[in-house]
């Protein structure tokens, strides 16, 4: 089944069609985010869901490079969390981000993670600060990522299992075979 193969088929998609997402698709994506595990069930994450084309275009400038495709996505999900609610907010937000991506793949949609934390715009402004400014995000929340989602605009081959680096797997101790 596709569920068994999600990690094989989930590939970063930076090219999208013009087709919008259905409300059911958006709700399913957000359910996956809200069901994602978090440390001590702190649920320190929050999400801003953007489908407005002008806002997507503006958000596409959140980094100096590797974010322009956000403008062509049907949806962008900004993943943020409250460091005061969890000392492992980065991990919690990262898990939520990948849950959104895996759910997108399961729906037959494409997605791509845009890293915001510790990145900068073309003018040198911290990407986190840029995103805070355009989306009116409260200061206590830190933005980790933007997940761009849409209908796939190109085909990508599944991950080639022949390239798996099995030497990075250690049994019982480092170096164990």
Feature names for model-found ranges:
Residues 1-177:
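Acidic, surface-exposed loops and disordered segments
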């Amino acid at each position: 089944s596709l569920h068994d193969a999600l990690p094989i088929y989930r590939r970063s998609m930076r090219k999208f069609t013009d087709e919008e997402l259905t409300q059911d698709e958006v709700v399913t994506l957000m359910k996956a985010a809200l069901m994602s595990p978090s440390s001590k069930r702190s649920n320190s994450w929050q999400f801003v869901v953007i489908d407005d084309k002008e806002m997507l275009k503006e958000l596409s400038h959140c980094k100096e490079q590797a974010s322009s495709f956000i403008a062509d996505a049907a949806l962008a999900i900004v993943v943020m969390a409250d460091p005061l609610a969890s000392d492992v907010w980065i991990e919690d937000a990262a898990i939520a981000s990948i849950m959104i991506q895996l759910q997108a793949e399961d729906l037959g949609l494409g997605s791509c993670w845009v890293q915001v934390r510790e990145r900068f715009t073309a003018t040198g402004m911290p990407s986190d600060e840029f995103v805070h400014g355009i989306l009116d995000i409260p200061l206590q929340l830190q933005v980790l990522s933007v997940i761009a989602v849409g209908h796939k605009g190109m085909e990508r081959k599944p991950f080639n299992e022949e390239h798996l680096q099995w030497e990075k797997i250690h049994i019982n101790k480092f170096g164990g075979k």
